[in-house]
Amino acid sequence: MPTIQQLIRKPRQPKVKRSKSQHLEQCPQKRGVCTRVYTTTPKKPNSAMRKVAKVRLTNGYEVISYIPGESHNLQEHSVVLIRGGRVKDLPGVRYHILRGVLDTQGVKDRKQRRSKYGAKRPK
């Protein structure tokens, strides 16, 4: 416990809150180019082949981002837009790719929650 005199000399420093998606640099989204598109397996209780992509952002950072929805058209050199948001059962995946933007197509035959997957309104 510091004395009052010590607190006058050197006041308390507020704790620095770090962003959970630092490589976006305070932007809501960032553009990038896919350098590798692959599947990976989730942590212990879950089992699947999750689709992820390694993306080089316009600011030079390289991040791993998740491709949501069923099937995708991404390959190497596809230009994508990413947003923050981690995938709980994939370690190191802290970003999501936005569907229906730039080179990424929306999910086909999607009826509900279409805006999250870039799907057009069905006729």
Swiss-Prot record:
CDD domains: Ribosomal_S12. Transmembrane segments: none annotated. Keywords: Methylation, Ribonucleoprotein, Ribosomal protein, RNA-binding, rRNA-binding, tRNA-binding. The gene is rpsL. The keyword Transmembrane helix does not apply. The keyword tRNA-binding applies. The modification 3-methylthioaspartic acid is found at residue 89. This is Small ribosomal subunit protein uS12. PANTHER family: 30S RIBOSOMAL PROTEIN S12 FAMILY MEMBER. With S4 and S5 plays an important role in translational accuracy. Interacts with and stabilizes bases of the 16S rRNA that are involved in tRNA selection in the A site and with the mRNA backbone. Located at the interface of the 30S and 50S subunits, it traverses the body of the 30S subunit contacting proteins on the other side and probably holding the rRNA structure together. The combined cluster of proteins S8, S12 and S17 appears to hold together the shoulder and platform of the 30S subunit. One of its GO terms (biological process) is translation. GO terms for molecular function: rRNA binding; structural constituent of ribosome; tRNA binding. Belongs to the universal ribosomal protein uS12 family. Part of the 30S ribosomal subunit. Contacts proteins S8 and S17. May interact with IF1 in the 30S initiation complex. Residues 1-28 are annotated as: Disordered. Residues 9-21 have a biased composition (Basic residues).
